[in-house]
Structures are given as C-alpha cells and as structure tokens.
Amino acid sequence: MNVVILDTGCANLSSVKSAVARHGYTPVVSREAEIVLRADKLFLPGVGTAQAAMDQLRERELIDLIKACTQPVLGICLGMQLLGRRSEETRGVDLLNIIEQDVPKMTDFGLPLPHMGWNRVYPQAGNRLFQGIEDGAYFYFVHSYAMPVNPWTIAQCNYGEPFTAAVQKDNFFGVQFHPERSGAAGAQLLKNFLEM
C-alpha cells in the first residue's frame, strides 16, 4: 500500500512518519503530484500558523492537488484546520474550503491558551476512524484555534466549550489532536485510518 505524507513545509514530518512505520508501512514524504495522487492513504500534517501553511501550499502548488484527492486524506492538527473555509488568525486567512466551516480563536474562559496537553475526546458512535477506541479516551492537543462543532464533526472535545476534535467530509478526515503523540489511542486511530 502506498502511504504518502504530504511535504507541506510546515510540519514535523518525522514523528508522523515514525508513527506510521510502527504499523508496518513505509511512508513516503512527497509533494510530487504523481506520487500524491497514486497514494492509497495521504497524511496532511501541519504546525505553526495558518498563513504560513497556506503560503507554503500555494508556493508548492499543492492546493489544487489536495482538492483533487479521492483517496482517504487525514489532516493532523493545523492540517485539520486547513480543511476549513477561513481562519480568524491575524486578519483572516482563506483556507482550502473543503469543509465549509470557519476556524476561530478559542475563547479562554480563564483557561490557558494554547490548549496544550491531554484531553478527552468523544466520538460519534460507530465512526470507523474511532473503532476500538473508548469513548472519552485521552488524546494530546496543542492549539489556540479550533473548528466549532458543525455538521461534519465526528468527535468532540471540551475546553471551556465544546469544539471539533475530529471531522469528516467524504474522503477527507481531520483530527485536531496529534495521534502520533497520543499513546495507544492515537496508534489505534492511525491503524484505523491506514486500514480503511
């Protein structure tokens, strides 16, 4: 099976690569159109700011390539946010608009931002991405912006208020947490995605 990690220029690719390799796959890091489109599974990782990430995707001519994907795609952390319509970061950043939902800054409710550390995730019953993962399992988060709960939400988390921890629209999946840093639950989620 061809597993590709998209070289977005704004992610710690080695941790995702290692986590995938632990499941017996040999992922390829690439931004070449023919390799990406031939992938059976595609990872879209991202860290940092939405503006820097979108600039990198534009510069590397990856925006239309991502939108053309028909295989399962998993956005991780900022990679999930990039699937949205618009980030409220700085003066507003247009995103990939695969999921028609804006990504606002989280309200602090007296809690520290960024939201950093372990938190419980509550998936929709029966969702295949969370198969074999208990309701309320802990996952590791680092973020200050979050997609509100919306029609494409497949898992929620609460940090002062509910927000989208995972999303799905057609073949596009996204997780706000870092499965590669989330122990057994994260490993199971990656396994579920890889075996779809």
From Swiss-Prot:
One of its GO terms (biological process) is L-histidine biosynthetic process. The keyword Hydrolase applies. Its EC number is 4.3.2.10, 3.5.1.2. Keywords: Amino-acid biosynthesis, Cytoplasm, Glutamine amidotransferase, Histidine biosynthesis, Hydrolase, Lyase. Pfam families: GATase. Residues 2-196 form the Glutamine amidotransferase type-1 domain. Pathway: Amino-acid biosynthesis; L-histidine biosynthesis; L-histidine from 5-phospho-alpha-D-ribose 1-diphosphate: step 5/9. One of its GO terms (molecular function) is glutaminase activity. The keyword Hydrolase applies. The active site is at C77 (nucleophile), H178, E180. GO terms for cellular component: cytoplasm. Signal peptide: none annotated. InterPro entries: Class_I_gatase-like, GATASE, Imidazole-glycPsynth_HisH. It catalyses: 5-[(5-phospho-1-deoxy-D-ribulos-1-ylimino)methylamino]-1-(5-phospho-beta-D-ribosyl)imidazole-4-carboxamide + L-glutamine = D-erythro-1-(imidazol-4-yl)glycerol 3-phosphate + 5-amino-1-(5-phospho-beta-D-ribosyl)imidazole-4-carboxamide + L-glutamate + H(+); L-glutamine + H2O = L-glutamate + NH4(+). It is found in: Cytoplasm. It comes from the Bacteria. Heterodimer of HisH and HisF. IGPS catalyzes the conversion of PRFAR and glutamine to IGP, AICAR and glutamate. The HisH subunit catalyzes the hydrolysis of glutamine to glutamate and ammonia as part of the synthesis of IGP and AICAR. The resulting ammonia molecule is channeled to the active site of HisF. This is Imidazole glycerol phosphate synthase subunit HisH. It comes from Salmonella typhimurium (strain LT2 / SGSC1412 / ATCC 700720). The lineage of its organism: Bacteria, Pseudomonadati, Pseudomonadota, Gammaproteobacteria, Enterobacterales.
